[in-house]
């Protein structure tokens, strides 16, 4: 170590330091997100829908895939349940995450039965915003984890009538027989 005299400046002559991010720093809430896919169940006529969004997190080094699961009740409870899974896209961690993804999906959406209909990012954001608005209007609490889904709440999406109808059709099954119609009304 060299002794520095008063008034003299000491310059660091060692190589530049590099900051390495650890895996614990990876977070879905603060990471940049790129939309991969989304789907909604066609169970709206039952009064509830399940929504799943899949994001790629390009800035994360290991856990670079983020899945969001929403359970929404259109009649009474609004946006009722939120769960998420942050996982690696490849390797052994990804295989382990498959079980967790299936478990979360089955617990929230599997019981609904309906078909899974693909959505665009715009449609998925609109659905989340509609149910958050529902909760706020009825003074219902939002599910925990808002720091992970609040990015979906802005900017506000306004669907025109054609877009709104197309989105409603994606959430509702097509009746192909009179028996299905009768069954629907009996179950309601």
Which stretches of residues belong to each language-model region?
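Non-catalytic terminal/accessory regions
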Residues: 4-188
């Amino acid at each position: 170590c060299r002794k520095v005299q008063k008034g003299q400046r000491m310059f660091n002559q060692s190589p530049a330091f590099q900051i390495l991010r650890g895996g614990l720093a990876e977070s879905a809430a603060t990471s940049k997100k790129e939309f991969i896919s989304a789907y909604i169940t066609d169970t709206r006529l039952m009064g509830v829908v399940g929504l799943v969004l899949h994001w790629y997190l390009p800035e994360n080094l290991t856990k670079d895939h983020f899945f969001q699961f929403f359970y929404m009740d259109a009649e009474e409870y609004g946006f009722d349940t939120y769960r998420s899974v942050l996982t690696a896209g490849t390797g052994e961690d990804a295989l382990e995450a498959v079980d967790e993804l299936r478990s979360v999906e089955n617990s929230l959406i599997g019981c609904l039965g309906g078909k899974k209909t693909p959505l665009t990012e715009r449609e998925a954001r609109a659905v989340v915003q509609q149910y958050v608005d529902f909760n706020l209007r009825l003074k219902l609490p939002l599910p925990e984890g808002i720091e992970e889904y609040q990015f979906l709440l802005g900017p506000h999406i306004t669907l025109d009538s054609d877009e709104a109808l197309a989105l409603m059709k994606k959430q509702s099954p097509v009746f192909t027989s009179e028996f299905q119609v009768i069954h629907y009304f009996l179950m309601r």
